[in-house]
Amino acid sequence: MRLTPHEQERLLLSYAAELARRRRARGLRLNHPEAIAVIADHILEGARDGRTVAELMASGREVLGRDDVMEGVPEMLAEVQVEATFPDGTKLVTVHQPIA
């Protein structure tokens, strides 16, 4: 299987998000990179499912709460930006204050 660098990056992000979800399911709080991976994966999969940029910007704020992440992580994450592929092209999705 041959993957482009872009596809390798997406695959790595997807795996990091899956690992973070398993840790969260075990009751562990997520660190900064894990939180970004989960939110970014949510956006990428939502775009693949045909959701709009506005929907993903709103739902991206509901993926994780303060109880899901380690202390200090919400303050470190002012925004998460992901370049996602939509049916009508690639767009930058920005989620401001992703951990409420």
UniProtKB/Swiss-Prot annotation:
InterPro entries: Urease_gamma, Urease_gamma/gamma-beta_su, Urease_gamma_sf, Urease_subunit. Its EC number is 3.5.1.5. One of its GO terms (biological process) is urea catabolic process. One of its GO terms (cellular component) is cytoplasm. It holds the Pfam family Urease_gamma. It is an enzyme of class 3 (hydrolase). One of its GO terms (molecular function) is nickel cation binding. Keywords: Cytoplasm, Hydrolase. Optimum pH is 7.2. Pathway: Nitrogen metabolism; urea degradation; CO(2) and NH(3) from urea (urease route): step 1/1. It is found in: Cytoplasm. It catalyses: urea + 2 H2O + H(+) = hydrogencarbonate + 2 NH4(+). HAMAP family: Urease_gamma. Heterotrimer of UreA (gamma), UreB (beta) and UreC (alpha) subunits. Three heterotrimers associate to form the active enzyme. Belongs to the urease gamma subunit family. This is Urease subunit gamma. The gene is ureA.
